[in-house]
């Protein structure tokens, strides 16, 4: 009897050892168009090599920075090489109808991010950041092939700084979050009744006067209650250029919003001749 129990127990252990490895499904935002999972994991080196063509220098540098900031992993960049642990690949045959589409291939010993445009590679990089995990000091990825492209060509966020000035660092943080979510249009509301936020050198009073107010209305519109605190600020033309460049490197187009002739009280306070009675 005991020998039979022992045999059954050994059979159970044998069957358990023959089961396929578990698959850890991704939790991604936004969710991709298609994922095909394969049992097993791709394990990258502790200091992986990142290879890329010259046209993807910006994208390679961004990915290197992400690996460092997100996972404390230092990747080595190798330009115009074919073999590496992480490969960025431009190929016009990849989803040719989808300018921002990409394929993330994690089926062998390395990771290949391929697309027909730098914009597609950037989207692949953002997904790659989400699927990566760290185990025993190494980056691992569930084996899979992931295909994705945006459903909407215009994926926008609007920041209203006409009413409340936020500052350049807040804008940079917002652009980073937009890039992570694959959003590609930044509506930048820079003027309104409550403030003028962009330097116009020919009309300096727009920022000397129009960018500042002595107090802000609180509770709700028309409450006639004010906080008594001075508020304001503006962006120089050089700072505007910095933001536009930062956004462009993340496939984000900046659309400045300038209110005229309505919602222009800040401009009229600076130059009364702009108004009518």
Summary of predicted features, one role per range:
Residues 5-6, 61, 236:
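Hydrophobic alpha-helical segments and their boundary regions
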Residues 4-15:
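Sec-dependent N-terminal signal peptides
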Residues 95-277:
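Feature activates predominantly on carbohydrate-active enzymes
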Residues 11, 18-155:
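Acidic, contiguous N-terminal accessory segments
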């Amino acid at each position: 009897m005991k020998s039979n129990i022992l045999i059954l127990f050994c059979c159970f252990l044998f069957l358990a050892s023959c089961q396929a490895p578990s698959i850890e499904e991704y939790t991604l935002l936004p969710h991709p168009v298609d994922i095909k999972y394969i049992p097993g994991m791709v394990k990258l080196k502790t200091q992986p090599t990142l290879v890329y063509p010259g046209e993807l220098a910006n994208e390679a540098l961004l990915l290197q920075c992400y690996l460092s900031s997100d996972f404390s992993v230092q990747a080595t960049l190798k330009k115009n090489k074919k073999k590496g642990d992480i490969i960025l690949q431009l190929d016009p045959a990849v989803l040719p109808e989808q300018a921002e589409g990409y394929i993330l291939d994690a089926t062998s010993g390395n990771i290949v991010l391929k697309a027909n445009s730098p914009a597609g590679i950037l989207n692949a990089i953002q997904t790659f950041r989400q699927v990566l995990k760290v185990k025993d000091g190494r980056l691992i990825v569930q084996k899979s092939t992931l295909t994705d492209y945006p459903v909407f060509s215009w994926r926008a966020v609007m920041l209203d700084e006409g009413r409340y000035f936020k500052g350049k660092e807040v804008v940079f943080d917002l652009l980073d979050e937009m890039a992570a979510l694959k959003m590609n249009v930044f509506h930048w509301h820079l003027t309104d009744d409550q403030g003028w936020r962009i330097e116009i050198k020919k009309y300096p009073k727009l920022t000397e006067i129009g960018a500042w107010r002595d107090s802000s209305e609180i509770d709700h519109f028309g409450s006639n209650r004010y906080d008594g605190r001075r508020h304001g600020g503006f962006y120089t033309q050089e700072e505007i250029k910095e933001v536009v460049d930062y956004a462009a490197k993340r496939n984000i187009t900046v659309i400045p919003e300038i209110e005229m002739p309505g919602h222009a009280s800040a401009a009229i306070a600076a130059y009364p001749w702009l108004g009518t009675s």
